């Protein structure tokens, strides 16, 4: 909670200590690090110990989950010949970005233990730089995955991107993540500072200057609006294409007086259109879950009522991004048929059981007459 007295923000009594002491946020920072604490945070009492404990436990779980899930993706996709396809390089790149984000978690755990950013300005810059590169890189990689799926499924013969094209897209994802990560690092435009419980760092969205407002607007469009628009457009066009394709097949089957032209049609299978919609919705919602909280907090902090941005509220976006980086490998890769087959073969103790490829699919390619429901559900069987 945030209050203002006659002379400005005042600290709350830290009830968690039970001794009536008054401790504002940042009081535990060493004297040489006090300049890092934005005046906004000093208007709040120190967070209760159980808040820190809750986030501490959550970050440990997320860190272990991210290392395991993304580590499996990188290991399987990089060592399996059947998975070394152009499209799968994008999934591998996403796992690398997600694992890169995980490198911040040990730093956070140390910060939460001592109560301040270990390493001072340099430690804060490194933490925020890692988060910026991995976050913006993952967002644009998600957009390129959506674009690749649209190209592949809408035109399975000539629409597949080549190795060279995919490598260029991957290089572009790292270039895309660089400008708005490096500019605040050198304080050319924007800057990094502690946020929330003052144990994490991000770009400054609290300083009310015209220059900083322009920075927040620009990074919002760059890291959120553009990738989200690309994802939405790609999956909308993909969904539209599949719907038209299924309608055409249904009309042709009616003319030929047969039930269906799809090679894999049966009463137990979910319709292709529904599976496409479900997969697209999951992917799109994950992106929104990851970046909408940060966008909302940053926009409110820069243009709205800053008193709404409490330490607890500003910690939620950080938790959301870390959570999605752990979910990505399961959404993007665990539903990949050939990936599941590799897991079943190499790690049978995971209990994964995947239907083996049938003769109806040659080399993992979709037939011209039909599109595999599993392929459309999440990933082309490359």
Swiss-Prot record:
InterPro entries from the UniProt entry: GPCR_opsins, GPCR_Rhodpsn, GPCR_Rhodpsn_7TM, Opsin, Retinal_BS
UniProt subcellular location: Cell projection, Rhabdomere membrane
UniProt topology in membrane: Multi-pass membrane protein
Cystine pairings recorded for this chain: 124-201
Region described as Disordered: 357-382
Glycosylation-annotated residues: 14
Gene Ontology cellular component list: membrane; plasma membrane; rhabdomere; rhabdomere membrane
Membrane spanning residue stretches: 50-76, 89-112, 128-147, 166-190, 215-242, 279-302, 311-335
Residues modified to N6-(retinylidene)lysine: 322
Tissues in which the UniProt entry reports expression: Expressed specifically in the retina. Each Drosophila eye is composed of 800 facets or ommatidia. Each ommatidium contains 8 photoreceptor cells (R1-R8), the R1 to R6 cells are outer cells, while R7 and R8 are inner cells. Rh5 is expressed only in R8 photoreceptor cells in a subset of ommatidia.
Family matches, as Gene3D superfamilies: Rhodopsin 7-helix transmembrane proteins
GO MF terms, alphabetically ordered: G protein-coupled photoreceptor activity
Entry comment on modification after translation: Phosphorylated on some or all of the serine and threonine residues present in the C-terminal region.
UniProt topological domain (Extracellular) ranges: 1-49, 113-127, 191-214, 303-310
Polar residues compositional bias, start-end: 358-382
Protein family per UniProt: Belongs to the G-protein coupled receptor 1 family. Opsin subfamily.
Record PANTHER family: OPSIN
Name the UniProt record assigns to this protein: Opsin Rh5
Lineage summary: Eukaryota, Metazoa, Ecdysozoa, Arthropoda, Hexapoda
